[in-house]
Amino acid sequence: MRDIIKDYGKLETEKRERGVLDEYAEMCRYQNERQRKNNEDFSDEDLTVDEQENIDSGKEQNLKRENTQNEQIKEMGQVVLDSNSRKHKVELLTIIGEVEGHESAPSHSKTTKYEHVLPKLAIIEDDEEIEGLLILLNTVGGDVEAGLAIAEMIASLSVPTVSLVLGGGHSIGVPMAVSADYSFAVPSATMVIHPVRSNGMFIGVTQTYRNMEKIQDRITTFISEHSKASQKRLEELMLDTSQLVKDVGTMLEGKEAVKEGLIDEVGGIKEALAKLYEMIEKEC
């Protein structure tokens, strides 16, 4: 008798569960049907001419903006980052390959042309909508005057700036990396510090040496003023003969660059953007 009662109770429970499931399934079918009818009832025909024109205009503007961004990325590696959840408008600037200055680099070389970068930095300073600048660096160095000009421009911007060294920040790339308000380097990044070099004919050895010494002093002064590394330590790293086989100088990896005070922190794009957003919000 107990088994019969038990089986009966089990059967009733199963019926109730099936009933709940059937009721839930029916409710889902009803909601789906209602949504389908709503979609059918609302069509482009219900929009006024002005509403339809606004929609078409918005689509056209988005398409133009996307095409412009793609063209900027293709030509100069520059784009505006404004799709983040915090709604901040950030300019992205990439400095890659060789920094090209007063003389054109070989046609097969990847270059960053300073005549493209300087006007862009001026636009960033002038545009009230731009809230910050993120600089991505992977450069072998290049023209000293051009590199220092870019570094000075970045350092003088009023908006928050963050740099991220990817791959390499060599030679004149070091001042550009430290010119930002805050700097990052990925763990595998390298930074090479070496004495100033020059190609071509030297008329007077003494005069040329003094000129090179002044240029080198300008570089080390800028780096020491925009990082935690002292000028004395920078000169020691520049003149080190124990690291580079065919050259004088020092190669520092990500963590070593932080330890020497050149770079503020080891990190990637996530950390760099998070820091930039934090700096922007502190200024608001």
Please annotate each region the language model reported.
Residues 1-164, 168-172, 179-194, 199-284:
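N-terminal organellar transit peptides
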